[in-house]
Structures are given as structure tokens and as C-alpha cells.
């Protein structure tokens, strides 16, 4: 077992008001899913190094928010990198709606919002950023997301001209517009 100070602690809480939580539970049950995300016995080490973490398991239902807590170097970002398919775990598995996911599948089904958003924003305007990679006309959806994130007035602005918090809202907006079933925020 890893020393207590290197273990990853995690807590589960619902981040929505009561009525919203009920909506997400109803939506989840109506789609016949028991858990949106299941992580079982995940472990990781860099090449021949010691374990960064091991035996990490948790479940997250649709609408749940999970906070991963730990000191610097505990493996929080490494865990997110595995969950998003950027790194391959040493052991364990990640499932979405009961289906085991490969790292490649995890990359396409999740969206990672990083603390330093400058590496995630590429377009010439906020609106263009939200529509990148979309195959269909999604103007109504983009308008709704811009309104919800209080970014409507910044639609035509270059992402680099926004504050740090506004940039983070843009990256969260991208995840919402793309309907990513799982959103990770680091």
C-alpha cells in the first residue's frame, strides 16, 4: 500500500440544486444506464518507476461531480490524463455506460479543461472556438451556451483577449457544445 500522504483522496457530491439533480437522475434512468463512468482498480507508474497511484476505483452517475484531492505530485493530473486517454494505465479499467473503453475511445468521448487554457484555444473568435469540429449547423446551441456562460458579449472577441476565467468558460462551453459525456477539469 502507498503511504497515506501519496494516496489520492476523492469525494463525491452533487453540484446542482435539488431540481436539477432530479432532472439528471431521471435522464440517466430513462436512458437505462446505471453509471455514466466506472473506474476500477486503476494504477499507473512511469516506465520502471514506482507506482504513482494504484487501486483507484469510483463510480460517477450522470450529473455527478467528483473532486480529486491530493498534494502536489500525488497523481491528480496523471489520473485525468489516463481518464482522457492521454496516458495508458498500468492496470485497471475505465467503463462508460458499462462498456470498457480503450485510451483512443476515451480521447473521443471526453473533454479535458485545463487550468492553463492558452493551450486549448485556437480560433479567431469565441463563437468560432465553440463551433470548431462541428459537422452540423449548431448556431442555436452555441447561442444558448454563450448565454448560459455569460459570454454573449464576447462572441466576436479573440480568446486571447479574454480574462483567465472567461477563457475557462469558453473551454467548458466547447465541451458542452460537443455533448461530451464526460468533462474533466484540471
Spans of model-derived segments:
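Helix-to-loop junction immediately C-terminal to a conserved catalytic motif
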Residues: 84
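Catalytic Walker B motif of ABC-type/P-loop ATPase nucleotide-binding domains
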Residues: 183-186
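The feature captures the beta-strand-to-loop junction immediately N-terminal to the Walker
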Residues: 69-71
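Conserved ABC ATPase signature
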Residues: 158-162, 166
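Hydrophobic anchor residue at the start of the ABC signature
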Residues: 172
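Conserved ABC ATPase "signature" region
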Residues: 139-154
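Conserved ABC transporter NBD signature motif
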Residues: 92-106, 110
Amino acid at each position: 500500500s502507498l503511504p497515506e500522504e501519496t494516496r489520492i483522496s476523492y469525494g463525491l457530491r452533487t453540484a446542482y440544486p435539488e431540481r436539477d439533480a432530479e432532472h439528471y437522475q431521471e435522464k440517466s434512468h430513462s436512458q437505462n444506464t446505471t453509471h455514466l463512468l466506472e473506474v476500477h482498480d486503476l494504477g499507473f507508474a512511469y516506465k520502471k518507476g514506482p507506482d504513482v497511484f494504484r487501486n483507484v476505483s469510483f463510480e460517477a452517475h450522470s450529473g455527478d461531480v467528483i473532486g480529486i484531492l491530493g498534494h502536489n505530485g500525488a497523481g491528480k493530473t496523471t489520473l485525468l490524463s489516463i481518464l482522457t486517454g492521454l496516458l495508458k494505465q498500468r492496470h485497471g479499467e475505465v467503463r462508460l455506460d458499462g462498456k470498457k473503453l480503450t485510451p483512443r475511445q476515451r480521447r473521443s468521448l471526453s473533454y479535458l479543461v485545463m487550468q492553463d487554457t492558452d493551450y486549448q484555444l485556437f480560433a479567431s473568435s469565441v463563437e468560432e472556438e465553440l463551433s470548431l469540429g462541428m459537422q452540423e449547423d449548431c448556431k442555436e446551441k452555441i447561442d444558448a451556451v454563450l448565454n448560459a456562460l455569460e459570454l454573449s458579449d464576447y462572441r466576436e472577441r479573440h480568446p486571447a483577449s479574454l480574462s483567465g476565467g472567461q477563457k475557462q468558460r469558453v473551454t467548458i462551453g466547447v465541451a458542452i457544445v460537443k455533448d461530451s459525456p464526460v468533462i474533466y477539469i484540471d
